[in-house]
Curated annotation (Swiss-Prot):
GO terms for biological process: protein deubiquitination; proteolysis. It comes from Homo sapiens (Human). One of its GO terms (cellular component) is nucleus. The gene is USP31. This is Ubiquitin carboxyl-terminal hydrolase 31. Widely expressed.
Length: 1352
């Protein structure tokens, strides 16, 4: 049997580097020559395609990983040829075998000559591109992100999705469910593709086959069209969920529904939930709350989600660019930029133009004009969303019309006249304008004048050619004329506005153009024959069509013949409009990508919105339609959080992409502010929705809301077309890579956050496996590769070093150390004795993830235990346990395989209740207590633990006589963290070194399988007779059931045959050699007692004399008695431990445990019996004294069996004291204090009286325990029905004087608690003080017991 070594010092580390290199080279060449071997590691490695005859190809890039995996796999099994093959984590790593099978192979570290460091030339598993098969970039980017989802990739690549799936039969008549596509072929192809990426065996054929299967199952993905990556991601996850759900139904497995759900919460409808791995990993729930504005009642709806689609906060304004046409003799235009709100009316645009140009709003006319002339006119009531940034908007400044009081402001006219003076000189100023004349005349009119109503505003533009093919030229302008103006004057006014465009020598004699009125209906021209053309009905109709806002106006188009235009005008094609400074400012402000944070996106997502009037909701309380307010909020969170940024928007008929920069954290995304704050009562409501992700309790770990980024899907381009890439963080080397189809480039962390990010993949920090490079506890690249799941891919040889290391250092190891089976871990701890305990629990291991179903599932270290995915799948496979219950290792493995599944099932119960339930229910069927133990579910032991520590503090305060000695150890134990308290106390009991069993030791004769019944039946019989088991809760019952078994276990540990001194292995002990010496000394002093069953009240003069004889050996014996009796309590009466199941000639473990556990009134009682009857055992005593080092590794197999059969082995010593035993302990301490005080007053008669009074209250309990001993004789096996001659007589002594027995129990308990509450061995000085106090107590107990023994 190989010995478990610490990390870094295994047998492979001792081998020379040269031998390993040559061995790995030979192994690699042989594997290549045979084509990688059937099922060998080479079958899944990159070396298979290489040429077997080329020596240079053996050192190629693609073959490096295969050689490393082969070497590690073979080196780990040089010493264990018969190991079972690795099944990818689906089953336990322990090989099946009989009860006496050797311990599983050790977990050595990587070889001494590590692989060369990864560089750019060496391939990294998972870093491989995907071929683009025609616009499949959306598929490639999504697959790369899923491939780097650690737990999902492990689940697919290791084939764990096949658990429980029936083998496909070739029978054509087999029902196909959904047809050919109903057999999970999408999941199968996805698993093949992911496996090829991580084994570096990818070829374009893999992705081509996957696309073919996808197109076969989803018609929309046929062809080479572009698609949205988020839509494909949701489709793929949903399809994998359906495939897994279909396989579960085919296998006949019941849905993963908590069995106690309907029992605890009967209200509300109940429905079965088929939970799959996709749901457990990606799915969570959000809550939609609808609040009535009248009665404030709230209606909640809960819905699941796989992906959160977050809106991107948009800027509150958007830019619009308007060309302003100023009023004046010469048309002066300028382009300005204004910011308008996202929603509103055109009045906001008019106000913005007015603020920018200082023109009054009632003098601004907004129209739309393109190359062919006028189009729309805008009024104030028009929707602003109908005006887009690319529209050509013109704002005409019109002259101010007469106000009601008849005052006309000439601001615009004078301003533009000044501009005309500067620009065009005095020649133009000398021309008389009818408009200016009319304005001057109007200014002098009386307030009652109606002259203003006779004027009309004309918006004029020029257009070459007639009909629909014309094109606008020149600048538009404004005319303010009388309605009754004649045709000739109208023609002159138009030519006057265009005079500076005319050639200098041209003299116009006749009308060269025609006038067209832009009306609502049809095309209407003004004829020259009309005396007053502006009085035409079409003009009146155009004026009436103008909406509110601005000045009423008429749009005229002056249409010129092309030859006439070329003859009269010059430079008409150069229509230059300057831009104001505001245009540049608005472009910089709005066209640059807006920056926001991911937290702002969540705030916008959870923002309260008011329902529209059309969506009014009938309140069930008010019975009326109400415009309620709706709020979305996150109710639960998944382990893998997928966030989709809504970059694509549909605005009417236009679709656009938001290029906003969303800043997201790479690590430490805290989701606490975005999760619903729940009260105590709301955690359990409602009962009918989603039991797979129901929240429990208020004591959630804050780490559950912390997420780290591991992948980003990017979209480059616009809404019409673009390209997808993926940024992923590799779990082997922890580096970021950019996957652009088949091109892969390394990326720095600063380059991950870009404005092209589209889908974000976050992983819960507590769900990151320990083997991942993304974990905070992960080691170097080589060590993480050794523990990575890639090393356990199908096709590898018997469980490789990486498989063994990861499987034992992860969920199974952490599970067994944190909750169950601590005693059996001594055989295969995988180096945990030298490794911090927190690592194995805080981080998950292979195929394991944090159990978030129950936040109350916290172990004694205030951490939630890790449930192995392999353990869940093992139970889901519905196969019986393949281990016989005789071996502690196998029972531990089979029990652990079923713990995680049941813990996820019973989400409404504390994990401890489930663990106690399973640890007992999966014992051997012959154990009679297993059926009763199966019902032990109730309140979590956290409350029990609080009560225990409270009782311990009370007991410490009562113990005033030995407060100096007790306070040191008790205070030390209180200061220590939980990891050094309960676990080490348990290790002192059951953590026996089983790695050094010597075949020649006499202990080998004690066969564990010969006594399973007695050890299993004692807890049952004791529990049945316990009077305190009626009024207590079921967890306390389960705790008490474990105590008698632990008593027998402890006795077998502490009082084995003299040849096995039985050292106690403590992981935190500073000196191992010192513990061995002490244990051997204890063994020589303890195991020399000839009496198999020392009575509780045996206090002969010889034993009293031996107390007074001081010797170093007695001090060691006293320390041993105090140190090893770690988990016994006052309730462990001597009755169950008195009947020894072993023959007297072989081992006196249980019989002698009575003298150590029951009496303890005299430390010298063992010594006295040893001196009187040490002749038969003297050779063994000398052997034990001489062979200290050899005896340190020996053990009694029955002790392991006792710890295995005990349903509550891992319940710590503090948890083993219930209220009944605490009452007895208090009475014992009180009697002890009284005895000691009265002894100091040297009043022996009074001492006897007080002791009898103090012990009278517990006589019935001790007598009843004696009756239990009598009743339990019928349960003993035939080998155990050979009591010694003096056993019966000594039991009668117990019934005669119960008070003194309580005192002796008190002595043991006080000395025991002072040593074990600290969690670690005390210093030499502290140990001596503890020994002195135990000697004083024992002598005081003897002195007080003398008067009570005289009548006997």
């Amino acid at each position: 049997m190989s010995k478990v070594t610490a990390p870094g010092s295994g047998p492979p580390a001792a081998a020379s580097g040269k031998e390993k290199r040559s061995f790995s080279k030979r192994l690699f060449r042989s594997g290549r020559a045979g084509g990688g071997g059937a099922g060998g590691p080479g079958a899944s490695g990159p070396a298979a395609p290489s040429s077997p005859s080329s020596p240079s190809s053996a050192r190629s890039v693609g073959s490096f990983m295969s050689r490393v995996l082969k070497t590690l796999s073979t080196l780990s099994h040089l010493s264990s040829e018969g190991a079972a093959p690795d099944r990818g984590g689906l089953r336990s790593c322990f090989p099946p075998g009989p009860a006496a099978a050797p311990t599983p192979p050790p977990c050595p570290p990587p070889p001494a000559s590590p692989a060369p460091p990864a560089c750019a030339a060496e391939p990294v598993p998972g870093v491989a591109g995907l071929r683009n098969h025609g616009n499949t970039c959306f598929m490639n980017a999504t697959l790369q992100c899923l491939s780097n989802t650690e737990l999902f990739a492990e689940y697919l690549a290791l084939g764990q999705y096949r658990a429980g799936r029936p083998e496909p039969s070739p029978d054509p008549e087999q029902p196909a469910g959904r047809g050919a596509q109903g057999q999970g072929e999408v999941t199968e192809q996805l698993a093949h593709l992911v496996r090829a990426l991580w084994t570096l065996e990818y070829t374009p054929q893999h992705s081509r086959d996957f696309k073919t299967i996808v197109s076969k199952n989803a018609l929309q993905y046929r062809g080479n069209s572009q698609h949205d990556a988020q839509e494909f991601l949701l489709w793929l996850l949903d399809r994998v969920h359906e495939d897994l759900n279909h396989s579960v139904k085919q296998s006949g497995q019941p849905p993963l529904k908590p069995p106690s759900e309907t029992d605890m919460m009967p209200e509300g409808p109940s429905f079965p939930v088929c939970s799959t791995f996709v749901q457990e990993l990606f799915q969570a729930q959000y809550r939609s709350s609808l609040t009535c504005p009248h009665c404030q009642k709230q209606s909640n709806t809960f819905d699941p989600f796989l992906c959160i689609s977050l809106p991107i906060p948009l800027p509150h304004t958007r830019p619009l660019y308007v060309t302003v046409v100023y009023q004046g003799k010469c048309s002066h235009c300028m382009r300005i930029g204004v910011a308008v709100p996202l929603s509103g009316t055109v009045a906001r645009l008019r106000e913005a133009v007015s603020m920018e140009t200082k023109i009054p709003t009632d003098q601004i006319v907004l129209t739309e004009m393109y190359y062919d002339g006028f189009h729309r006119s805008f009024c104030d009531t028009d929707d602003l969303e109908t005006v887009h940034e690319s529209d050509c908007i013109f704002a005409f400044e019109t002259p101010e019309i007469f106000r009601p009081e008849g005052i006309l402001s000439q601001r615009g006219i004078h301003l533009n006249n000044n501009l005309n003076h500067l620009k065009f000189g005095l020649d133009y100023h000398r021309l008389s304008s009818p408009t200016q004349t009319a304005a001057k005349q109007g200014k002098m009119d009386s307030p009652t004048s109606r002259a203003g109503s006779d004027k009309i505003v004309l918006l004029v533009c020029n257009r070459a050619c007639t009909g629909q093919q014309g094109k606008r030229f020149g600048l538009p302008f404004v005319l303010h004329l009388e309605k009754t103006i004649a045709w000739d004057l109208l023609q002159k006014e138009i030519l006057e506005k265009m005079k500076y465009f005319l050639r200098p020598t041209v003299c116009i004699q006749v009308c060269p153009f025609s006038l067209r009125v832009v009306s609502v209906v049809g095309i209407t021209y003004l004829l020259p024959q009309e005396e007053q053309p502006l009085c035409h009905p079409i003009v009146e109709r155009a004026l009436k069509s103008c909406g509110p806002g601005g000045t009423a106006h008429v749009k005229l188009v002056v249409e010129w013949d092309k030859e006439t235009r070329d003859f009269l005008f010059v430079n008409t094609e150069d229509e230059y409009i300057p831009d104001a400074e505001s245009v540049r400012l608005q472009r910089e402000r709005h066209h640059q990508p807006q920056t926001c944070t991911l937290s702002q996106c969540f705030q916008l997502y959870t923002k309260e919105e008011r329902l529209a009037p059309d969506d009014a909701w009938r309140c069930p309380h008010c019975k009326q339609l109400q415009q309620g307010s709706i709020t979305l909020s996150l109710w639960t969170l998944p382990d893998v959080l997928i966030i989709h940024l809504k970059r694509f928007r549909q605005e009417g008929d236009r679709r656009m992409k938001l290029q906003n920069m969303v800043k997201f954290p790479l690590t430490g995304l805290d989701m606490t502010p975005h999760v619903v704050k729940r009260s105590q009562s709301s955690w359990s409501l409602p009962s009918h929705w989603s039991p797979w992700r129901r929240p429990y309790g208020l004591g959630r770990d804050p780490e559950d809301y912390i997420y780290d980024l591991y992948a980003v899907c990017n979209h480059h381009g616009t809404m019409q077309g673009g390209h997808y890439t993926a940024y992923c963080k590799n779990s082997v080397d922890g580096l970021w890579y950019c996957f652009d189809d088949s091109d892969v480039q390394q990326l720095s962390e600063d380059e991950v956050c870009t404005q092209t990010a589209y889908i974000l993949f976050y992983q819960r920090r507590t769900a990151i496996p320990s083997w991942s490079a993304n974990s905070s506890v992960a080691g170097s690249t080589s060590s993480s590769l050794c523990e990575h799941w890639v090393s356990r891919l199908p096709g590898s040889k018997p469980a490789s070093v990486t498989s063994a290391a990861s499987s034992r250092r992860t969920s199974l190891a952490s599970l067994s150390e944190s909750v169950e089976m601590t005693g059996e871990r001594s055989e295969d701890d995988g180096g945990f004795s030298t490794r911090p305990f927190v690592r194995s629990v805080q981080r998950q291991s292979l195929s394991s993830r944090s159990s978030v179903t129950s936040p109350l599932a916290v172990n004694e270290n205030c951490m939630r235990p890790s449930w192995s995915l392999s353990a869940k799948l093992q139970m889901r496979s519905n196969s019986p346990s393949r281990f016989s219950g005789d071996s502690p290792i196998h029972s531990s493995a089979s029990t652990l395989e079923k713990i995680g599944e049941a813990a996820d099932d019973k989400v409404s119960i504390s994990c401890f209740g489930s663990l106690r339930n399973l640890s007992s229910s999966y014992q051997e069927p012959s154990d009679s207590h297993s059926r009763r133990e199966h019902k032990a579910v109730g309140r979590a032991p956290l409350a029990v633990m609080e009560g225990v520590f409270k009782d311990e503090s009370d007991t410490r305060r009562l113990n005033s006589s030995v407060v100096d000695t007790q306070s040191k150890h008790s205070a030390q134990g209180d200061r220590l963290p939980p990891l050094s308290g309960p676990f080490d106390n348990n290790n002192q009991i059951a953590y026996v070194d089983q790695s050094d069993s010597v075949d020649s030791s006499p202990v080998k004769e004690v066969k564990a399988p010969s006594h399973p019944g007695s050890l299993a039946k004692k807890p049952e019989s004791t529990t049945k007779r316990s009077p305190s088991s009626k009024g207590t809760s079921e967890p306390e019952k389960s705790l008490r059931k474990g105590r008698p078994a632990l008593a027998s276990q402890e006795s077998s540990l502490s009082s084995t045959s003299p040849s096995s001194p039985l050292p106690v292995k403590v992981s935190l002990k500073p000196s191992r050699s010192r513990s061995k010496a002490d244990s051997s000394s204890r063994g020589s002093g303890r195991h020399s007692s000839p009496a198999p069953a020392q009575p509780k009240k045996e206090s002969s003069p010889k034993s009293q004399d031996s107390v007074s004889s001081p010797s170093p050996q007695k001090q060691k014996s006293a320390s041993a008695l105090t140190y090893t009796a770690s988990s016994t309590s006052a309730k462990k009466a001597s009755g169950p431990a008195t009947r020894s199941p072993f023959p007297p000639g072989k081992s006196r473990t249980s019989d002698h445990s009575l003298s150590r556990e029951g009496s303890r009134q005299s430390l010298g009682s063992d010594r006295a019996s040893a001196t009187s009857t040490s002749k038969p055992n003297s050779p063994r005593v000398s052997q034990a004294r001489a062979g200290e080092g050899r005896g340190a590794g020996k053990h009694v197999r029955s002790s392991s069996m006792a710890s295995l059969r005990s349903p509550s082995t891992s319940i710590k010593s503090g948890l083993k004291r219930d209220s009944k035993s605490e009452d007895k302990g208090l009475s014992f301490f009180k009697s002890a204090l009284r005895q000691k005080e009265t002894r100091r007053s040297t009043d022996l008669g009074k001492t006897a009286l007080l002791s009898k009074k103090a012990g009278g209250s517990s006589v019935k309990s001790v007598c009843k325990n004696t009756g239990d001993d009598e009743a339990e004789r019928g349960h003993q096996p035939p080998a155990s029905q050979q009591p010694n001659a003096n056993t019966t007589g000594k039991e009668q002594l117990v019934t005669k004087d119960p008070a003194s027995a309580k005192h002796s129990l008190l002595s043991a308990r006080k000395s025991k608690s002072s040593q074990l509450d600290s969690g670690v061995p005390s210093s030499p000085g502290g140990r001596q003080s503890a020994e002195k106090s135990s000697k004083k107590l024992s002598s005081s107990m003897q002195t007080s017991a003398r008067p009570s023994q005289k009548p006997q």
